[in-house]
Amino acid sequence: MIKKNRRCAMRRKGSQKYCSEHIIYNESSSIVNTDTKLSEDERVPCPLDGKHTVWKKNLAVHLKKCNAKPVERTEEWFSKDINVKLKNSLGETEDITRSEDKTLDEKDLYSKYIPIIEGINFEPLQYRISEHSGLQQRLNEVLIQKHALQQSSLIGNIKDAKLLSPNNTFVEFGCGKAELSRFVNLCLLDDLKQKVNNEVTLENYGYGFIDRGVNRMKMDKKILKDCLDSPIEITPRIQRTRIDIKDLDLDKFINKLQPSKIVAISKHLCGAATDLTLKSLLNSSLLSDNRDKFGGLLIAMCCRHVCSYDQLLPKSREYLAEKGFKTPDSFRILKKMVSWAVCSKKEHAKNVERLEAEHISQLDYSSRERLGFVARRLIDESRVYALKSMLSGFEVKMFWYVEKDVTLENVCLYVGQEPM
């Protein structure tokens, strides 16, 4: 496999040069099966997901069982593309898209936009490295501590913002198996055992899990078991949905959880999912008619290199335009520069000077890494600008929640009524 620079692990027939998945790449550029017994058969990309292929004669059967087959959605909170745009054009600005970059090739785009990034300076963020005693046992048990340190700091900051309470319902976006929520629950139980929370109403406690993927080893049952094993009599409501955030009607999802207050959390919410999460909150009643039900938001952001220009908040696009990034093509180059922040010089790299000279930017590793962090900060600041422009009465800020040697994706976004 040229793209991955390794051999395919699948087995092939003796009469064929390629396995069934890669037979479409045979030397004749034909997708006809070379097996003489199946000479009239043909390997074709799956219409539902072109990443895999299927024998044409089996296509009808395959389409009935393909994992990419669209599922008919019946959940009341499913609303197709509800968060692609803001409701009632909230925060919309005039279309600032320009076609001025269409005629430029990639090298010219780098030449145009690298000087802009070099001219931008930000004050360093504040470090808010916190911890929670409820995760001390986990830190003592695990050999590789980077995830536990991040979880402990995030939960410590949730507590510092006065959001770690069984009066709240925690909604984890991009939850995966909901490991962060499980440790939020353990830390909350630890606080209750130490009688840190004196005034609590346990009937409002719960969790909502949102993820578009299929996840194994989910923590839902472990959260309930942790509560059963605790001396504290508490049983949280738990509701999980497999859904893309762009299709989530948040008001209808949280309605069944019967929350007193909602706290939105996530650890490493990837790329456009962060912007869609912000849109889902802005499209809900939590930041308008039911502000008293919004406790706060605390998410660790990551992967700005897979953000989408179309999914940015309108005010984010406005901010980027003011900084010189006015077009989708300019944003595409900005995203590529963002990747330099987490793909710096590798210790084992050979022929470093030649690799640097051949790079399209003509920059060395250290320069690319430095500019990558500026580019990443620019996207983050656009989100903060948008939220501050659209929300009144809320604290909006970013901070570093762990050191860079724990994770390079160490920026946390906070929105709440309590200052931090």
Curated annotation (Swiss-Prot):
Zn(2+) binds at residues 46, 52, 62, 66. Keywords: Cytoplasm, Metal-binding, Methyltransferase, Nucleus, S-adenosyl-L-methionine, Transferase, tRNA processing, Zinc, Zinc-finger. GO terms for molecular function: tRNA 2'-O-methyltransferase activity; zinc ion binding. It is found in: Cytoplasm; Nucleus, Nucleolus. Its main location: cytoplasm. It comes from the Eukaryota. A zinc finger (CHHC U11-48K-type) spans 43-70. One of its GO terms (biological process) is tRNA nucleoside ribose methylation. GO terms for cellular component: cytoplasm; nucleolus. Its EC number is 2.1.1.225. Pfam families: TRM13, zf-TRM13_CCCH, zf-U11-48K. The keyword Chloroplast does not apply. PANTHER family: TRNA:M(4)X MODIFICATION ENZYME TRM13 HOMOLOG. Belongs to the methyltransferase TRM13 family. tRNA methylase which 2'-O-methylates cytidine(4) in tRNA(Pro) and tRNA(Gly)(GCC), and adenosine(4) in tRNA(His). This is tRNA:m(4)X modification enzyme TRM13. It comes from Scheffersomyces stipitis (strain ATCC 58785 / CBS 6054 / NBRC 10063 / NRRL Y-11545) (Yeast).
